[in-house]
Amino acid sequence: MTPAHPSAPAPSPNLALNQLVDRRRARGESLVHLAFGEARLPVLPQLAATLAAGASRAAYGPVAGAEDVRTEVAGYFTRRRQPTTADQVVVAPGSKPLLMALQLTVPGDVLLPSPAWNTYAPQARYAGKRVYGVPVPAECGGVPAPDALRTVLREARAAGGDPRLLILTLPDNPTGTLAPPALVRELGALAREEDLVVVADEIYRDIVHDPDRTPFLSPAEVAPERTVVTSGLSKTLGLGGWRIGVARFPAGDTGERLRDGVIAVASELWSTLAGPMQHVAAYAYAEPPEITDRVRAAARLHGAVARAVHRIAVDAGAACRPPTAGFYVYPDFEPLRARLAARGITDSASLAGALLDGSGLVVLGGHLLGDDPKALRFKAATSLLYGDEEQQAAALAADDPTRLPHIAGELDRIAKGFARLLD
């Protein structure tokens, strides 16, 4: 596979599309926004009160985060079968800067599942790394197919590359699926065999739709000595604008070296997470009942709406993995290629353009996610279909949120937009 080389900075495509939607809506256009993975939910009153109570935390604190905060985060990971001490934790203004700091800290090139979240590859390039995309298996996204990973490693090294960092997303953005435990075990063994550092982005972990039927195994349980886990509160609690991220580093020398490297980068970039946000983090990661109740309700809502969009895509003739976590679906319109080609739709860019121009549906084309640009795939984020704050609250409480008029109306527009592709 030909690696991608460093290039000039460009705006993040999902953020650029989000701003495009704002501009066009300001001009009076009616758009269905499926291109931005924001968990649009009302802020819990207890979170707002905690933020206000933390206003007096105005001084600079430790770069890694205050000890009380890191202790609560350590407890969160320990409750998820990842025994953790406060010294293994770093908190930051979102998980995105932590991922960038890891790219700057871990030597060598980067291996990514293809497709993948659109931020990993640009960060790697800014860090001067080559990026090697590896196809995902048929059953899920977020992880590379093991045989394909072995092939890419062999070919990259033969060509002079030095892949040492493997980034996984569990559950996955963009496919809304979760790698099964057997596959995670195989990849953990492969990472150990090939001496790869693993970064497991687990920011969607707590919004698996049905955790009793969808078991979660972290790479940190399989290869604990080489796995860094990142997470945050943006997806589970709808706090994207508050920018609270965390990282858990392995115990032992490797983990200490990686943690110290990230802290060094942090000291030059963000200094410390804002004090009031640390106050929020300590409260949220302690997981009092009101937090866990909200997360469960959010997972039910995300699951119901994502499954509805999945059904619409399949009914339209697309192939699509059933979503099991988060709020994404990743339809593949390859079965309709001949009919779409007759309308000038031959790749993901023209497919996304046709949906926008013909139906006001804003999606993120697969070519922006490291996927084959000739494929007819795109990501649809379903979490902005919940309406205004009052409607969001109603959706969280509803037995079937897809029957609420404001959500049903958006789903109907999506179905008509997909059908219009073939008119």
Please annotate each region the language model reported:
Residues L112, G133, V198-A200, V363-G365:
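Hydrophobic residues in well-ordered beta-strands that form the structural core
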Residues G141-T214:
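Active-site phosphate-binding strand-loop segment of PLP-dependent enzymes
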Residues R226-R300, D412:
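Conserved core segment of the aminotransferase class I/II
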Residues T2-P93, P137, E287, Y386-E389, ...:
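N-terminal small-domain helix-loop-helix segment of the aminotransferase-like
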Residues P83, A341, A354-V363, L369-D423:
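PLP-dependent enzyme catalytic core of the Aspartate aminotransferase-like
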Residues R24-R27, A127, E193-E194, A316:
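Helix C-cap/helix->beta junction micro-motif
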Residues L104-L168:
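PLP-dependent aminotransferase-like
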Residues A299-R307, V314, C320-R339:
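Conserved glycine-rich beta-strand-loop-beta hairpin in the small C-terminal domain of fold type I
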